[in-house]
């Protein structure tokens, strides 16, 4: 289970720039496709062997240029509740504002480590100006320039030194860990209640060592697994779940703690931007996926044509990853809910599936010979050998060739698709690595 670091601060202090600098991406700023524009608010950072999730909580506020005090307060409260370390970003050029002081006042009362990041210190002459930030009472300000990267490496050193030691969840049995995720009112609580029902003797709540993690052991109908919850679904109910960034941030720990995620969609509303954001978290964490279209009892026309229409629309929105099961259920009437668990178990088993090396080469090499990678400057790229890496959390295949650097993503997708056509990896991501032979 990874740690979470949250970036907070008023608008225009450089939170998104810092986020892009630390995660090494410019993904959402460069690529403003519908449904992906909020992707930049969540990323993975690895530094000196330590990994953490980084969240720009301010990015979840709509029209963040015109943020009101109330929205900033909400943003900070979310960070306090969810994060292990908080980066409080301020602007060394403009100094302290009333809004900065209000944020600092809230942060002083919280029990999380806070690092004051004095941004826009683009040259060393500006560093002395950061002394006024001592008045926050939150310790020594850390001068950086997110725009040119000055001192951001030192900031990362400071962050990883401040992170709490990761505690490993020790569960009594090695069982699939299944998370029910989705935006508010998609039916998460209803599905969990349908699974658990009144038979409280069939479940055992195991408090995780990580804050707010709860593993509910489920054994019924011959199925055994842990239901992963971070107290966001059953314990806290609908408190603040109307806030999009709140429910998505809340999903992060649940997803990171799971093997397979059941993404709940509302049949009456189709697939929306918030569904896309949560799907993006599943993809980035390389978890197994089952998509459930809930509230199917409310749809009058349940013909195969309508089912096909829903299925096509979902796969188009979630492309390029389309090899996942889609189930049409009703948590309220308990229609097909057992199928959800059975399918999640199949996806879990696909994650640990191994293909014998001899069979892999026997099937894939003739395909590659018929459809070789594009030549580079007249040089032919020859893939000579394929193997699957030893069991990990994600099935991973290595293709050995003479010019690995010239095999691009479209051809890697082609290889992945051919593997999926020949072996059942439904619901699980696949890693494709190209190495020099």
Swiss-Prot record:
Residues 353-437 form the KH-like domain. GTP 1 binds at residues 9-16, 56-60, 119-122. InterPro entries: G_ENGA (IPR031166), GTP-bd (IPR006073), GTPase_Der (IPR016484), KH_dom-like (IPR032859), KH_dom-like_a/b (IPR015946), P-loop_NTPase (IPR027417), Small_GTP-bd (IPR005225). Keywords: GTP-binding, Nucleotide-binding, Repeat, Ribosome biogenesis. Signal peptide: none annotated. GTP 2 binds at residues 182-189, 229-233, 294-297. It comes from the Bacteria. Residues 3-167, 176-352 form the EngA-type G domain. Associates with the 50S ribosomal subunit. Belongs to the TRAFAC class TrmE-Era-EngA-EngB-Septin-like GTPase superfamily. EngA (Der) GTPase family. PANTHER family: GTPASE DER (PTHR43834:SF6). This is GTPase Der. The lineage of its organism: Bacteria, Pseudomonadati, Bacteroidota, Bacteroidia, Bacteroidales.
């Amino acid at each position: 289970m990874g740690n979470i670091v949250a970036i907070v601060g008023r608008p225009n202090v450089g939170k998104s720039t810092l986020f892009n600098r630390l995660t090494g991406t410019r993904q959402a700023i460069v690529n403003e496709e519908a449904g992906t524009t909020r992707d930049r608010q969540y990323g993975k950072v690895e530094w000196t062997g330590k990994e953490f999730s980084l969240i720009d909580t301010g990015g979840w506020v709509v029209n963040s240029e015109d943020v009101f005090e109330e929205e900033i307060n909400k943003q900070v409260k979310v960070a306090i509740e969810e994060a292990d370390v908080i980066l409080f970003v301020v602007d060394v050029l403009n100094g302290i504002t009333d809004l900065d002081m209000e944020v600092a006042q809230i942060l002083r009362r919280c029990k999380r480590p806070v690092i004051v990041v004095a941004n826009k210190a683009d040259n060393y002459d500006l560093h002395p100006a950061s002394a006024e930030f001592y008045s926050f009472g939150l310790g020594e300000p850390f001068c950086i320039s997110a725009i040119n990267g000055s001192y951001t490496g030192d900031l990362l050193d400071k962050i990883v030194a401040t992170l709490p030691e990761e505690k490993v969840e020790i569960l009594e049995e090695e069982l699939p860990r299944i998370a029910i995720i989705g935006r508010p009112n998609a039916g998460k609580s209803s599905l969990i209640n349908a699974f658990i029902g009144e038979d409280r003797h069939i479940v055992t709540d195991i408090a995780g060592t990580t804050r707010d993690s709860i593993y509910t052991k489920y054994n019924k109908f011959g199925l055994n697994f842990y239901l992963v919850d971070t107290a966001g679904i059953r314990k806290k109910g609908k408190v603040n779940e109307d806030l999009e960034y709140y429910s998505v941030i809340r999903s992060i720990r649940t997803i990171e703690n799971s093997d397979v995620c059941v993404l709940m969609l509302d049949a009456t509303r189709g697939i929306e931007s918030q569904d896309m954001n949560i799907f993006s978290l599943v993809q980035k964490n390389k978890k197994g996926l089952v998509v459930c279209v809930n509230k199917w009892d409310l749809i009058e026309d349940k013909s195969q044509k309508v089912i096909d229409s829903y299925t096509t629309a979902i796969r188009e929105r979630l492309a390029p990853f389309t090899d996942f099961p889609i189930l049409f259920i009703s948590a309220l009437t308990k229609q097909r809910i057992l199928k959800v668990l059975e399918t999640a178990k199949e996806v879990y088993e696909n994650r640990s599936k191994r293909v014998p090396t001899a069979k892999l080469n026997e099937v894939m090499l003739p395909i590659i010979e018929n459809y070789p990678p594009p030549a580079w400057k007249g040089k032919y790229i020859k893939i000579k050998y394929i193997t699957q890496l030893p069991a990990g959390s994600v099935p991973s295949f290595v293709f050995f060739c003479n010019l690995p650097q010239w095999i691009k993503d479209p051809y890697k997708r082609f290889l992945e698709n051919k593997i999926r056509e020949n072996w059942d990896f439904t619901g699980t991501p696949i890693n494709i690595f190209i190495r020099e032979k």
